[in-house]
């Protein structure tokens, strides 16, 4: 089984954050290479935000991500590898 590292969680979270791009919902697939592993994250996610009012301006950072559905696949040269990806763990990096 492929063990998902904190670095891979960070990479997946960064790519998801970029794909959300200020929106309140994401549905799609993100494919990327991580080291010698090809990864594909497919999800439908509801994005909750918190409104922050500060002297330098307002912001609406992500306060929670609620997955409607998700899959995370990892592939090597030999084919697909089972992995221990956990959506809750990835949320810590968003």
Where are these regions (language model features)?
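Acidic, low-complexity intrinsically disordered segments
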Residues: 2-25, 29, 54-94
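Beta-strand elements of well-folded, non-transmembrane domains
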Residues: 30-38, 43-51, 76-78
């Amino acid at each position: 089984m492929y063990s998902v590292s904190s670095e891979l969680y960070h990479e997946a979270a960064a790519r998801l954050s970029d794909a959300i791009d200020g929106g309140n919902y994401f549905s799609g697939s993100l494919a990327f290479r991580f080291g010698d592993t090809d990864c594909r994250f497919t999800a439908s996610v509801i994005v909750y935000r918190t409104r922050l009012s500060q002297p330098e301006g307002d912001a609406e950072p992500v306060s929670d991500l609620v997955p409607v559905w998700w899959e995370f696949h990892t592939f090597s040269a030999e084919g697909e590898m089972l992995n221990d990806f956990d959506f809750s763990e990835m949320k810590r990096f968003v």
